[in-house]
């Protein structure tokens, strides 16, 4: 595979922990950084990325069509949400058969091997059954989690299983981090979360009250705290040294209580 193309797999051992939000957030920030980015929706149960980006009306084809031979360029939505360089391959209903796993792997391998994108981000479903099959094709894997003990335990499990399946550079992203709850409810702080998961943390995304409203209207956040967090994560993935909560004045002031 061409070394110039960066390939990132997003996974989680359970649903509802910010996986698809993270996939969209990182892909959008990579495109805003000037990188031609392909975002692929392999969550064949939720199939939510076209909705999160407001592109339902343009999602005429998807991953299952590419599996069955449709050219990728004919299935991809370009300039998603008005962001130049952000492209989306939606998920569509896929019928499993005896050869599905092999065709899935071959199709993903072909997609991430293309040299016409700078960055490829692949979102998978809650649970790691699909992620395990395709993990070896990626440079890096992100596992998402929230603050709860069950979510952190699931992240640790997912990270270990994906590493056993050939995943490399496996990192943790903590989503919907509720700073007041660290003291009020004695929930896990950042250091405790990292210790519990045994994964290197590449970013913490604060709880963003604006996020749900933006997603419901099919808009990708920009200039919100969650968008700033994903911008920081994208820059770290590119090798930049970015402090935790950089650019988030309120979070930086309260950083000591979050650790």
What are the residue ranges of the model-derived segments?
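Acidic-aromatic/histidine active-site loop/patch
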Residues: 1-7, 170, 234, 240-259
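Walker A/P-loop NTP-binding active-site region of P-loop NTPases
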Residues: 7-71, 119
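Short amphipathic alpha-helical segment that frequently serves as the phosphate-/nucleotide-binding helix
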Residues: 20-25, 152, 187, 227
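Short, well-ordered alpha-helices that flank and scaffold nucleotide-derived cofactor binding pockets
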Residues: 24, 28-32, 136, 160, ...
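P-loop/Walker-type NTP enzyme "switch/lid" segment
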Residues: 42-115, 216
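Short, hinge-like loop/turn segments at secondary-structure boundaries
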Residues: 55-59, 161-162, 188-192, 219-223
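Conserved catalytic-core segment of NTP-binding enzymes
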Residues: 113-115, 119, 124-207, 212-213
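C-terminal boundary of histidine-terminating zinc-finger modules
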Residues: 214-234
